[in-house]
Amino acid sequence: MDEDKGIDSKESGEYEDDFEKDLEWLINDKEKSNGSMIEVACKKEDDLDQELKEKETETELGPQLSDPDKPPKDEALPRRNDFISVPSIQPLDPISDSDSENSFQDSKPENQKDLEDEEDEEVRRYIMEKIIEANKLLQTQEPVNDKRERKLKFKDKLVDLEVPPLEDSDTCKVLLENETNMSGKLSQLCISGDLGQESMLMSVTNGGCEENDRKILVERDGKFELMNLQDIESQGFLPPISSANGMEHESSQLPLRSANLSVGGIKKEEPEAKIHIMTLSQAGEPLAQVPQPPANPKNRPSSAANPDLNKKTRRSSHRIQSAGVSPVTSTYCLSPRQKELQKQLERKRERLKREEEQRKLEEENEKKKENEMVFKAWLQKKREQVVEMRRVQRAKQIEDMSSRQVNRDPQQAFRLWLKKKHEEQMKERKTEELRKQEECLFFLRGTEGRERAFRQWLRRKQIEKIAEQQAVKERARQLRLEARRSKQLQSGLYSVPEAKAFRFTDHYN
């Protein structure tokens, strides 16, 4: 697991370095392209002139041919966008070339040499023209924008959380010593039983040690404990193990099923296997016994296989153990400062959560207020609409009444008025009768009271009769007046057109 992480971090670091180097190289080349390419062209011209002179001298003296088109070392390095490919001629071996050239120059005519010189000059001119064109293209190119956002980004730190080393060096040393001692003891003897989630690792000490010091490292539910060997035997986890003072040359083979548990770098074992327990002689020296393979090769434990083939499985087992614990809940491996930072983060989260809840409550209250205001505005608008409708209805009723008064018939109006008056009189009569009954009940206490009440009643009757007669007379009088008025109006309407018809009018005088 660690090796994979190291390889991944190394590859990502190399990729990042290459990416940054390419960017820096592009930027530097773009900045230096304007001035450097002109200087390179000038240097090429000088080099070409020198090579021509050297070639002329060599042809006279007969030395070996030199390569006139060989570029300098500085420009031989490949580049990506600013690279200019120049055709080059491979140099020949100096010893073999000198002999072959001398023999070839003797047979070659002078005209052929002149043609080759002209071809070389044409090649040089073509190369120079290409270089000048490339320089012009580089000068016309736009500079690279350094402020643009990169598509590929990398973190400053590949690991978000780093656990600092232990501050106490003494404790580290003690832990390392304990681990080395324990690993040495575990290499002597390893007994594992399938008893739930418990695994026991036993180490047998030398013969000089006392029996009280013999302890076994026991794992129970992920916790390690040092327990006495006698306690383990009394609990029935292990058979009694012979000590230095016990029987000589005695070995016991126990077929046990190994549980799927591991401590440190010990591999989990699933199949059953026979574990040989080393015994001690009287002198305290252990008898060396070579472990024998099991009878059934199919049930061979996985630890007996090739370690190179089991690397992936071992890595996966470590991964399974380490991935079972959450880094948030397990604070035993954090420093005090990291714990304090974690507490601060938790406080910050709680504070943000409270602020979010408070903000939500405020938003809800604001929404309620807005809804109430909108409802009040809607209610006020409805009330105004109702008032306006009532006012319009009242205006319509007044208009209808006025139109009825203008166009009504007088006889129909009189009949309506008479009916209304009759209803009012009937109501008055009922009220009067009720009042009289009350008075009669009040005065009926003797003969004198009865006579007095009778006289009062007779008087009221006479008054009512007189009032009715007067009302009838008044009504008859009004009817006569209305009839007379109607007759006068009708006679006036008929008389006016008759008079106008027989009258002469002179419009010119």
UniProtKB/Swiss-Prot annotation:
UniProt record similarity statement: Belongs to the CCDC181 family.
Which proteins does it associate with, and in what oligomeric form? Answer: Homodimer. Interacts with HOOK1. Interacts with HOOK2. Interacts with HOOK3.
Q: Where is the composition biased (Basic and acidic residues)?
A: 41-58, 67-82, 337-368
What this chain does, per the record?
Answer: Microtubule-binding protein that localizes to the microtubular manchette of elongating spermatids.
Q: Report what the protein is called.
A: Coiled-coil domain-containing protein 181
Q: What stretch or stretches form a coiled coil here?
A: 335-377, 418-488
Q: What is the protein's species of origin?
A: Rattus norvegicus (Rat)
| Gene transcribed to yield this protein | Ccdc181
User: Which UniProt keyword terms apply here?
Assistant: Cell projection, Cilium, Coiled coil, Cytoplasm, Cytoskeleton, Flagellum, Microtubule
